[in-house]
Amino acid sequence: MFDLMAVTKALADENRVRLLAALEGGELCVCQLIELIGLAPSTVSKHLSTLRSARLIQGRKNGRWMYYRLADDQAPRTARTAVAWLLGVLDGRKRILDDKKRLEKILETMPHEACHGKHPSGSYRKNTNSR
């Protein structure tokens, strides 16, 4: 029952749904997701935490950066079924199509720059550490 309640709670927010749809294309850095959704980093992190708690997504840390992807076959059946259903329902929706176009531009113009503090808009502080 916990899985069902956690999944329905996670899907009850438009921004979390948008995050799931963005991850359909593969793994993304949290910085890229922040740029796509256009919310404060703390808000996006909270949404990602909710999705992760529901086991709809998985994350991995690489240095200072977190990367997220849709949950794999090891996720509970409830989570896998919910994600498959959701992505089917969202297919062709204007907001999701707009997000996909925006994400393409984000990935073209700053595949890793946002993660390293070099976003052209200046919305992120420059990283002074050499990498």
Regions found by a protein language model. Give the residues of each.
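Amphipathic alpha-helical repeat elements characteristic of tetratricopeptide repeat
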Residues: M1-F2, L97
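Beta-hairpin "wing" of winged helix-turn-helix
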Residues: S53-N62, R69-A71
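N-terminal helix-turn-helix DNA-binding core of bacterial DNA-binding proteins
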Residues: F2-T43, S49, W65-A75
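C-terminal regulatory/oligomerization modules of transcriptional regulators
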Residues: G25, Q74-R131
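Short, structured secondary-structure boundary patches
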Residues: L48, A54, R64-M66, A79-W85
